[in-house]
């Protein structure tokens, strides 16, 4: 007889090779055709809500690895919450307005762009945005991300724009908007103002100059008489092009200033900075004369502008520092925030003679028509000719750049619309402290950003966006925003979208008979600027959560990259506090940036960019998802081919665990064969208790957004508790015990229970693989058509048994000592397979002896040997175990090797019909064949 035919070998169609890149699209098709997402959400209707509100990616270009990280994290959250019983619909969104799209369209159009009407330009921008929405949508879906892909929110949709106008109107009603001439970050290349969130800081080379401003007034300070002609106040700047707009020099009221005598001149500067200034100016012979004096002693005294026909006033400002420079700060209110604020206090002119391209206007006279960067050289030349340039050098420093074109920015005063942050700052800070932040330092970071935030410049000098809904009276110039005008704009946008603003005159948009509330005038013009895109996306909590019946305000979670503390988290908080008095989110989770395995930023020029599309083609989306889960994503996340290969290896082990179980329950029908927990073998109960611990730990990790713990806990369970221990021990029972024996069905029941738990625990991460496993289960073994229509596993506390766990902890410690002895015997060629062995044990004490004696029947299976014997004394060939102190000897097993189970037994040969089999195998074969 061929005894191999009598062995219960594993059988499954679940493939060993994952081949994910080819298999996953079929699984995604199954989800789509069977409406798995829709059914999962419907199943949870009426349950407690958990709404993760999607921060909209920008509809421009293909998704990058940072997008993949963020979207997969969100998918893990919503899949887990849904499995856990929450009503957790996910509505993806896109940010579809703004400069990058307009920039791309005009660049593609070239010279033809100038001939486009506003409506034509906007139509082309809309088409461009929608093209990339569709492209990115397919890329996100290929990551395995589920959600309402057929009904996403787009910031260009009319219903969204209407809600945005409503938010604007509510804030206007509180008096939070004003128009003012203030310096803002300005991109001369893109020709528009930028918000703080659109500014990137990078290395920039700038001129560094020390300049002498001639003193105009006679004054005595520190016992030294300063007179016009030989006395100067020294300033330092890295923007010589702003000196034409200089109106004052700021000193700190509390700092000590001194007079320095050098080359017959008297120079005023901060005492603490004298040596550094003179060293950098390469002045060797100098001397401090008189005593130190406070900045207050020079307030309102006058210097002459170095080359313009006007004075430069000496003023006081707390913004002056001693970190660099001279302690005397060149002040141009039209070109700096601090300069502007101190200028208001002293009623200085907000002078910025430049156009939108960074070119000086006629107002600048000698510099008219020059680009600001060229003015640097011209100013330096003039100062040098007049003998007022103390020193010129060049420095590399962190400098603001445009997020879109990457060009250097300038500070420039222009007429802009602002939202007053000061008016709601206290409310916003209070709101921050009511939110749960992951990681916890996010709370302080956000609070600091809001505390330091200046008023929000919301106007942009572009066409592709939501127009600022303001009208101006042509008769008196009054700007008009009220309930009546807001309602008129909302009606227009609901009907035609924001493009309607450009189709009709102000009078056609406003209600019939509308008159200026200030002067009664009847002629109006519309504001030409559009809103900052951060106001677009910052209104999403109202535009999405309040307009969709199945969602609710506020959301339970915002989850974005750390750059959104100054971006979407920030703008959303401000609009929510301004309109609702509360934050729009109950919790905020942030992920770090993706870097290479050396911690370097991704860069095309370096060649270290990892594309999610390439990863999916090579490894599959589930490997990308596993990489996300393996990372402590709250810090920067490393990725490389080496790291992805490591994750592939971990995936292989998890997959092999599923395959082993599926193969060994192929003939198991839970309705007929399921063995109750209390009737199972002790090792089966032990692994079931370990499984309950796994459920607890993994559930807690998911709840705390600690997915790397899920990754490690599941991997350890598969490799340590399962592969290295339980699977090894039960293989003999599964393969060689009677097909329908209690011992085999007990092991199968346990494997079945483990599979049902394990596949659910990994489902939020390994979504495709979990579904694949589920579809390979026999219909009798599952209660739903998809893994994602099941419920999260619950801990069965009744399984816990301290006595059993204590006993098995001790037995498994002994097993470790036996395993080491077996390994030594293998190395010494004393045995081949562990089943060749007979293990002799000499316990360390009576307690250990009794434990082993009571369990002597299960020890061969536990150690995976043929025989185990207890002895009273050690002798030659014994090894003392490092775990328990037990003495272990390994000798050749007695008897003959069973042809069926490969265990040695003295009973082999006793049966005439089956002389090659041991007693156990004879009984099985006789019963079943």
UniProtKB/Swiss-Prot annotation:
It comes from the Bacteria. Zn(2+) binds at residues 898, 901, 918, 921. SUPFAM superfamilies: Anticodon-binding domain of a subclass of class I aminoacyl-tRNA synthetases, Nucleotidylyl transferase, ValRS/IleRS/LeuRS editing domain. InterPro entries: aa-tRNA-synth_I_CS, aa-tRNA-synth_Ia, Anticodon_Ile_BEm, Ile-tRNA-ligase, Ile-tRNA-ligase_type1, Ile-tRNA_ligase, M/V/L/I-tRNA-synth_anticd-bd, Rossmann-like_a/b/a_fold. GO terms for biological process: isoleucyl-tRNA aminoacylation. GO terms for molecular function: aminoacyl-tRNA deacylase activity; ATP binding; isoleucine-tRNA ligase activity; tRNA binding; zinc ion binding. Its cofactor is Zn(2+). Keywords: Aminoacyl-tRNA synthetase, ATP-binding, Cytoplasm, Ligase, Metal-binding, Nucleotide-binding, Protein biosynthesis, Zinc. NCBIfam families: ileS. Catalyzes the attachment of isoleucine to tRNA(Ile). As IleRS can inadvertently accommodate and process structurally similar amino acids such as valine, to avoid such errors it has two additional distinct tRNA(Ile)-dependent editing activities. One activity is designated as 'pretransfer' editing and involves the hydrolysis of activated Val-AMP. The other activity is designated 'posttransfer' editing and involves deacylation of mischarged Val-tRNA(Ile). Monomer. This is Isoleucine--tRNA ligase. It comes from Halothermothrix orenii (strain H 168 / OCM 544 / DSM 9562). The lineage of its organism: Bacteria, Bacillati, Bacillota, Clostridia, Halanaerobiales. The gene is ileS.
């Amino acid at each position: 007889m061929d005894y191999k035919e009598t062995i219960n070998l594993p059988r499954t169609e679940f493939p060993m090779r994952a081949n994910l890149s080819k298999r996953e699209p079929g699984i995604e098709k199954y989800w789509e055709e069977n409406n798995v997402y829709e059914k999962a959400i419907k199943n949870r209707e009426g349950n407690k809500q958990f709404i993760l509100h999607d921060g909209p990616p920008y509809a421009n270009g293909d998704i990058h690895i940072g997008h993949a990280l963020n979207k997969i994290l969100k998918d893990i959250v919503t899949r887990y919450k849904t499995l856990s019983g929450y009503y957790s619909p996910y509505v993806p969104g896109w940010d579809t307005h703004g400069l990058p799209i307009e920039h791309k369209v005009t660049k593609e159009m070239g010279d033809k762009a100038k001939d486009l009407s506003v409506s034509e330009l906007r139509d082309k921008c809309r088409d461009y945005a929608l093209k990339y929405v569709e492209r990115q949508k397919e890329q996100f879906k290929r990551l395995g991300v589920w959600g309402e892909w057929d009904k996403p929110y787009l910031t260009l949709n009319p219903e969204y724009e209407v809600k945005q106008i409503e938010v604007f109107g509510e804030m206007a009603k509180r008096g939070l908007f004003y128009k003012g001439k203030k310096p803002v970050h300005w991109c001369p290349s893109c020709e528009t103002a930028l918000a703080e969130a659109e500014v990137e800081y990078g290395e920039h080379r700038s001129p560094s100059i020390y300049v002498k401003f001639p003193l105009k007034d006679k004054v005595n300070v520190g016992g030294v008489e300063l007179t016009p002609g030989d006395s100067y106040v020294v300033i330092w700047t890295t923007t010589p092009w702003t000196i034409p707009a200089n109106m004052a020099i700021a000193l700190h009221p509390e700092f000590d200033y001194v007079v320095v005598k050098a080359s017959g001149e008297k120079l005023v500067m901060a005492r603490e900075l004298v040596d550094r200034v003179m060293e950098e100016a390469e002045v060797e012979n100098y001397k401090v004369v008189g005593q130190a004096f406070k900045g207050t002693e020079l307030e309102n005294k006058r210097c002459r502008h170095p080359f313009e026909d006007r004075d430069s006033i000496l003023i006081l400002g707390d913004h002056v520092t001693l970190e660099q420079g001279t302690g005397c700060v060149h002040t141009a209110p039209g070109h700096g925030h601090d300069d502007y604020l101190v200028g208001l206090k002293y009623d200085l002119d907000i002078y910025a003679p430049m156009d939108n391209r960074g070119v000086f206007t006629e107002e600048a006279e000698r510099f008219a028509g020059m680009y600001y960067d060229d003015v640097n050289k011209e100013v330096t030349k003039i100062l040098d000719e007049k003998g007022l340039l103390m020193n010129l050098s060049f420095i590399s420093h962190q400098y603001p750049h445009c997020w879109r074109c990457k060009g250097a920015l300038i500070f420039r005063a222009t007429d802009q619309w602002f939202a007053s942050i000061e008016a709601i700052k206290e409310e916003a800070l209070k709101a921050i402290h009511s939110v749960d932040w992951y990681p916890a330092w996010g709370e302080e970071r956000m609070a600091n950003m809001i505390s330091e935030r200046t008023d929000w410049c919301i106007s942009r000098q572009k066409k592709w966006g939501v127009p600022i809904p303001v009208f101006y009276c042509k008769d008196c110039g009054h700007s008009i925003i009220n309930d009546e005008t807001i309602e008129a704009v909302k009606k227009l946008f609901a009907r035609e979208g924001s493009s309607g603003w450009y189709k009709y005159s102000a009078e056609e948009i406003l209600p019939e008979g509308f008159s200026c509330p200030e002067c009664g005038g009847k002629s109006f013009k519309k504001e030409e600027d559009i809103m900052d895109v951060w106001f677009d996306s910052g209104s999403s909590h109202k535009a999405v959560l309040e307009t969709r019946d199945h969602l609710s305000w506020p959301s339970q979670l915002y989850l974005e990259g750390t750059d959104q503390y100054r971006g979407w988290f920030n703008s959303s908080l401000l609009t929510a506090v301004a309109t609702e008095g509360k934050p729009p989110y109950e919790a905020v989770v942030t992920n770090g940036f993706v870097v290479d395995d050396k911690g370097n930023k991704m860069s095309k020029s370096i060649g270290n960019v990892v594309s999610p599309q390439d990863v999916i083609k090579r490894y599959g989306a589930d490997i990308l998802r596993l990489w996300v889960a393996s990372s402590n994503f709250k810090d920067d996340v490393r990725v490389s081919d080496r790291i992805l290969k490591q994750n592939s290896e971990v995936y292989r082990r998890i997959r092999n665990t599923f395959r082993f179980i599926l193969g060994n329950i192929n003939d198991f029908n839970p309705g007929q064969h399921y063995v109750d927990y209390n009737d199972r073998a002790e090792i089966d109960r032990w692994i079931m208790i370990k499984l309950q611990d796994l459920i607890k730990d993994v559930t807690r990790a998911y709840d705390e957004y600690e997915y790397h713990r899920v990754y490690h806990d599941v991997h350890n369970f598969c490799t340590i508790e399962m592969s290295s221990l339980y699977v090894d021990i039960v293989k003999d029972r599964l393969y060689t015990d009677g097909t329908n024996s209690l011992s085999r069905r007990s092991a199968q029941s346990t494997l079945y229970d483990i599979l049902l738990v394990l596949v659910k625990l990994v489902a939020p991460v390994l979504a495709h693989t979990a579904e694949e496993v589920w579809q390979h289960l026999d219909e009798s073994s599952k209660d739903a058509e998809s893994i994602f229509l099941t419920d999260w596993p619950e801990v069965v506390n009744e399984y816990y048994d301290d006595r059993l766990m204590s006993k098995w902890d001790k037995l498994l410690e002994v097993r470790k000592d036996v395993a080491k002895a077996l390994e030594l015997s293998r190395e010494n060629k004393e045995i081949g397979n562990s089943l060749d062995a007979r293990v002799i044990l000499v316990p360390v004490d009576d307690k250990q002896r009794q434990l082993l004696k009571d369990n002597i029947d299960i020890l061969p299976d536990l150690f995976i040997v043929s025989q185990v014997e207890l002895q009273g004394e050690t002798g030659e060939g014994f090894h003392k175990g490092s775990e328990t102190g037990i003495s272990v000897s390994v000798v050749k097993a007695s008897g003959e090797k069973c042809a069926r189970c490969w265990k040695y037994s003295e009973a082999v040969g006793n049966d005439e019909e089956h002389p090659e089999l041991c007693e156990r195998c004879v009984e099985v074969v006789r019963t079943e064949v």
